[in-house]
Structure formats: C-alpha cells, structure tokens
C-alpha cells in the first residue's frame, strides 16, 4: 500500500512541470 502512494506522488510531481507549460497557452484561453 505505501509503495503505491509513493508512486502516485511521483506522477503528481511530473504533472506540475507540464501544467506550467499549459499556463502559457492558458492565457490565450482566458481571452
């Protein structure tokens, strides 16, 4: 069980840098 929780945390950290790149295109979506 604890091993699965650690793996889920690693996936969340990888999603954070991808979201920062989406923020650049998010400005166009707000307009």
From Swiss-Prot:
Give positions of region: Disordered: 1-31
> Which tissues express it?
Testis.
The positions making up the signal sequence are none
Q: Name one GO cellular component term.
A: nucleosome
GO biological process annotation, one example: chromosome condensation
Per UniProt, subcellular location reads as: Nucleus; Chromosome
Listed A to Z, the keywords are: Chromosome, Developmental protein, Differentiation, DNA condensation, DNA-binding, Nucleosome core, Nucleus, Spermatogenesis
**Is this entry keyworded Manganese?**
no
Name a GO molecular-function annotation: DNA binding
Superkingdom, taxonomy of origin: Eukaryota
This molecule's function is given as: Protamines substitute for histones in the chromatin of sperm during the haploid phase of spermatogenesis. They compact sperm DNA into a highly condensed, stable and inactive complex.
The name under which this protein is listed is Protamine PTP4
């Amino acid at each position: 069980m604890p091993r699965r929780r650690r793996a889920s945390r690693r996936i969340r950290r990888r999603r954070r840098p991808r979201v920062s790149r989406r923020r650049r295109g998010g400005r166009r979506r707000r307009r």
